[in-house]
Every structure is written in structure tokens, then in C-alpha cells.
Amino acid sequence: MRRMTIGTVDGLHYELHGGPIAGREVVLLSSGLGGSGAFWAPQMQALTQRWPVVTYDHRGTGRSVRELPPRYTLAHMADDMVKVMDALGLAKAHVVGHAAGGNAGLQLALDHPDRLAKLVVVNGWSRPDPHIRRCFDTRLHLLNDTGPEAYVHAQPIFLYPADWISRNHTRLMAEEAHHVAAFPPREVMLARINALLAFDIDARLEDITHRVLISASADDMLVPMSCSQRLAGRLPNADFQQVAWGGHGFTVTDPETFNEALVSFLEGA
């Protein structure tokens, strides 16, 4: 059984899987809007066979403190990654981020370039997009007009392909009950969504010189693949992985395909 270390820094719950980490490359995983480090369960075996892996719950979510600083932005998310690295004594880490977590990784590359080794951005974006805004507006209406139960019940529609939702109905209903019980305060979720809607680093993409893997699903119903294509085309040192099926959360629906590309990228020169 691999060693796991659990800790808290400035209200952020984190877990280190594997160790010791001295002299080793480390992978830091950053989740999407939901914020839970448990999102990465389908990647853990493939990664921990090779590297120590850090997961954490975003500020305001999961087991982390359930409040956010005023005027919350993606810069705060990037700063929180640095706090987790500092707590573990890491000079830098490979960062793998899904959507919001990938965007925070891009912000980290700009704000703290020396703390980032390689970066993987899954279904992310660099500037506001009309379709993303439409989806988030719908989520906001569900949350504000109906409540967390309706918000959570609708999430699979944004995240997964229809056939996968049908096949995994029992699993999704069990997860739904858990997500409703653990749902963040309304003001936290509103602030996180508004931070993502305000995120715009498009004019600075050429300043990010790190090795980056942009990974995208063609059938993502939340983030158009054109957003990932734009990232891959404008980042000076980016690789691009496109999968045909799997939805916004294809790291969950087709982990084998994603994990193979992820490991290959992180192991490469």
C-alpha cells in the first residue's frame, strides 16, 4: 500500500500519495468547478506507479475552508497551488488541471512560472466564450432560482455523453446524493463561476513557455473544442490531444485514453 500524507495549509485540505518526495518529480492535480480532489480517482493508479501525486480540495469546496477571499479570481486559485507546494516543500511540480483547474494552471504559469514544470490542461480556455457563458448562465439560474438539488441533478448533462449517462444511472444517482450533501455555500459557487467567466489571459498566451499538453474532447457539451485548439495554437510549446468521445469529463468516462497520453507527456523529454 502506498503511503499517504494528509495535511491542511491556510484552510486547504491536501493529500500526498506516495513518498518520500525529496529529489523526485511530483504531480499536482487540480480539479474543475466542483473542486474535489477525489475527481482524479481514475488517474491515481497510473500516476502513483510513477510519481508522488498531490491532490487537494479547492478553497471553498470539499474538506477545505468553505469561504473565499473578496473579489475571487483565478490568481487566487494559482496562489493556492503555491501554498500547497510550499507546505510540502516542493520547489515546483507538474500540474494537471481539468477545466477550472487547467485554467488555474495557466494562471500559475504566468504568475509563478518558476513553480511549474510541465502543465496539462484538460478542456480549458483562455478567454470568455459565448457557449461557455450560456452554460454557466444556465447553471446560475438553476442554483439561484431552484437550488443546489436541481443544480447537481443537471450536472451530468454538461459533463458526460448521453449514452454514458444512461449506462451509469445508478452510479450517478448515488454520487448526486453525496454532491448535494457536500454542496458548497451558494456564495462560494457563485464566486467560483464568476471568476471563471472573468478569466481572460488570451493576450498573454505567448508568454507561457512551459511544455504544455492541451487535451480536449470533440463532444464536450460545456467547453467548445475550439477553445482548446486556440490554446494549442497560441501557446509556443504545446502538444494537442483530441479524443472523439467522452464529454467534458472524459477523464472519467474514458480514463484509459487520457491516462496513456498523460503518462507519455509527463515521462517525455
From Swiss-Prot:
Listed EC numbers: 3.5.1.-
Presence of keyword Hydrolase: yes
GO biological process, one term: uracil catabolic process
GO molecular function, one term: hydrolase activity, acting on carbon-nitrogen (but not peptide) bonds, in linear amides
Limits of the AB hydrolase-1 domain: 26-144
Cross-referenced InterPro entries: AB_hydrolase, AB_hydrolase_1, AB_hydrolase_fold, Pyrimidine_utilisation_RutD
Catalytic activity: carbamate + 2 H(+) = NH4(+) + CO2
Top-level taxon in the UniProt lineage: Bacteria
Classification via SUPFAM superfamilies: alpha/beta-Hydrolases
Top-level EC class: hydrolase
Alphabetical UniProt keywords: Hydrolase
One matching Pfam family: Abhydrolase_1
PANTHER family: AB HYDROLASE-1 DOMAIN-CONTAINING PROTEIN (PTHR43433:SF5), HYDROLASE, ALPHA/BETA FOLD FAMILY PROTEIN (PTHR43433)
Stated family: Belongs to the AB hydrolase superfamily. Hydrolase RutD family.
Function per UniProt: Involved in pyrimidine catabolism. May facilitate the hydrolysis of carbamate, a reaction that can also occur spontaneously.
Protein name: Putative carbamate hydrolase RutD
Organism, scientific name: Caulobacter vibrioides (strain NA1000 / CB15N) (Caulobacter crescentus)
